[in-house]
A protein has these predicted regions:
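Membrane-embedded alpha-helical bundles of multi-pass transporters/translocases
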Residues: 1-524
Length: 527
């Protein structure tokens, strides 16, 4: 595929778009439950009802958005502004809805409405945004650089999200809800600016670079009725979970991110109600983590290229798991008032969290390449929709669970001194809860085999299939065939649409089970 020249401005502008994804998520995950229960008069159960309602909405909106952005290219607006970039342009003024969530002393229905509104805006922007890298390049190293730029900018936004509330609380007073409103307003302005840069410095895959199968699918879409379109949506969404490497990717992604969501949801409570410190201290510790997350992301770029995503992922999971356990050990050892130790543990946690943030979004950009080899189509939007749905569902689910457990443990909203059982519950969630989820991601990563070498083989074989219009195992080496089969999870001759994965291929016979062959070179199979 011919691509435009990619320079530093393109990497940085694309990465800046995740100020919306990571910055607002960091602020929401670390502070929203605390804001609702401290400044808005909501009980933990009421707050979790808001998150639950948003997830019901997400179950429809996120996959629908992925489907829409994949198919928007046939419309006048899609042809004029791009099937992906139109929604980014539309979202620029809409990001200011984020600030409406952070107005204090309003009622339950106000907070429900504002949360749902921003949730839809977030989805409308993030789903097409996440598809842009595979639209712009097929190259593994360029994709890695795009991912590195994205996560680096994301960590910069997380640093701001961590420190800003504490600074504003110090200026405006620790009991002033306006601190959070002004913090959200800063993020709204920044997100609008960053999305403008994304619009100006990114592009979509030219139509002449589409495969024959993709063009055929595009033509078929224009003749579908509403019922047929909905049926197609269901088939396309469910087909993503039939791709083995995507299931493995989701396992690593959710293992790392849900662990962070659990940790984030309870960390401010840990500082305020277990350590008996001001919320500004929590802000400083979260800021320390965010700084080291940024450092970790920079280090992960060469590590993932050198050792592969899965081994790098396991290393940072161990770092974050040990630091989570250390917070509880400090308390029970009577050392929790030693601020230097808290800073040290937070720094180690930041190194682990930064790596966990980087690896899944780095590997995500290659999943559509595996899918193209299987289906003969480019379906980035569908995968982005599923990713956004699982991300937001995991965040809200973690916060919901924490809120319910806190309520059951005897937590009282607005009360500065909590029952002793609440402290032990907070410590249990912070350490054991985080470790259990991390362990799930660690185990899944043992089976993940996508790396620089296997992707290079996949890419060369995909180019061959594009030229031929079908998969022919006789024209490839035994080792290359084994690598592609390992990633795709089906026999080579069943690739490039010769299976029933996806709507376009739904009437074809299913691919037979893959028979394991001889051992591959360890360079290809390490994971």
């Amino acid at each position: 595929m011919k691509t435009r020249k990619i320079g530093l401005a393109n990497y940085l502008a694309y990465g800046a778009g995740d100020f919306l994804g990571a910055g607002t998520t960091a602020l929401t995950a670390a502070w929203l439950l605390y804001f609702y229960t401290t400044f808005c008069g909501l009980t933990p159960i009421e707050a979790t009802l808001i998150f639950a309602a948003a997830r019901v909405l997400d179950a429809v909106v996120s996959p629908l958005m992925g489907f829409l952005t994949d198919n928007f290219g046939t419309t006048w607006l899609g042809k004029r502004f791009g099937r992906r970039k139109f929604f980014i342009l539309l979202g620029i003024p809409c990001v200011f809805s984020y600030s409406a969530m952070w107005v204090g002393e309003m009622g339950f229905w106000y907070y429900l409405a504002t949360y749902l509104l921003f949730d839809m805006v977030y989805t409308m922007i993030l789903v097409p945004y996440e598809t842009l890298v595979p639209e712009m390049t097929d190259d593994f190293k360029q994709k890695t650089k795009f991912s590195g730029a994205r996560i680096s900018m994301a960590q910069m936004s997380a640093i701001l999200a961590s420190f800003l509330p504490g600074i504003l609380l110090s200026w405006l007073g620790k009991d002033n809800a306006s601190s959070f409103f002004y913090a959200s307003l800063v993020f709204s302005v920044l997100c609008a600016v960053m999305l403008t840069l994304v619009w100006c410095f990114t592009w979509e895959r030219p139509r002449e670079a589409w495969s024959e199968a993709a063009l055929r699918a595009e033509a078929e879409k224009q003749n579908l009725t509403l019922d047929q379109s909905l049926n197609r949506l269901v088939i396309e969404l469910s087909s993503t979970l039939r791709i083995k490497i995507f299931r493995q990717h989701l396992g690593m992604y959710l293992g790392g991110y849900i662990a962070q969501d659990v940790f984030n949801a309870v960390f401010t409570y840990y500082v305020v109600f277990v350590l008996m410190q001001e919320a500004a201290v929590a802000s400083n510790l979260l800021g320390t983590m965010a700084i080291f997350q940024f450092i970790a992301v920079i280090a992960m770029i060469p590590l993932c290229i050198r050792f592969g995503p899965a081994p790098s992922y396991r290393m940072v999971v161990v770092l974050f798991g040990l630091s989570s356990l250390s917070y509880a050990l400090l308390y029970y050892a009577g050392l929790s008032d030693v601020y230097s130790l808290l800073l040290l543990i937070s720094a180690v946690a930041g190194l682990g969290r930064g790596g966990i943030n980087y690896v899944p979004w780095n590997t995500y950009t290659y999943i559509a390449d595996v899918d193209e080899a299987i289906t003969g189509q480019r379906r980035e939007g569908i995968f982005a929709g599923i990713m956004t749905l699982t991300r937001k569902a995991s965040q809200a689910g973690a916060v919901m669970l924490v809120g319910i457990i806190m309520q059951l443990s005897g937590f009282v909203s607005g009360q500065k001194i909590q029952p002793e059982g609440v402290s032990h519950t907070i410590l249990l969630i912070l350490s054991v809860g985080t470790l259990v989820v991390l362990a799930c991601g660690f185990l899944v990563s043992l089976r993940f085999k996508l790396n620089l070498h296997t992707h290079s083989v996949l890419r060369s074989e995909t180019l061959r299939m594009r030229e031929l219009g079908y998969a022919q195992s006789e024209q490839t080496s035994a080792e290359h065939r084994a690598v592609v089969e390992l990633l795709a999870g089906m026999p080579y001759d069943c690739l490039w649409g010769n299976n029933n994965i996806g709507y376009l291929n739904r009437h074809k016979p299913a691919a037979p089970a893959l028979i394991k062959g001889g051992a591959l070179n360890s360079t290809y199979t390490r994971g």
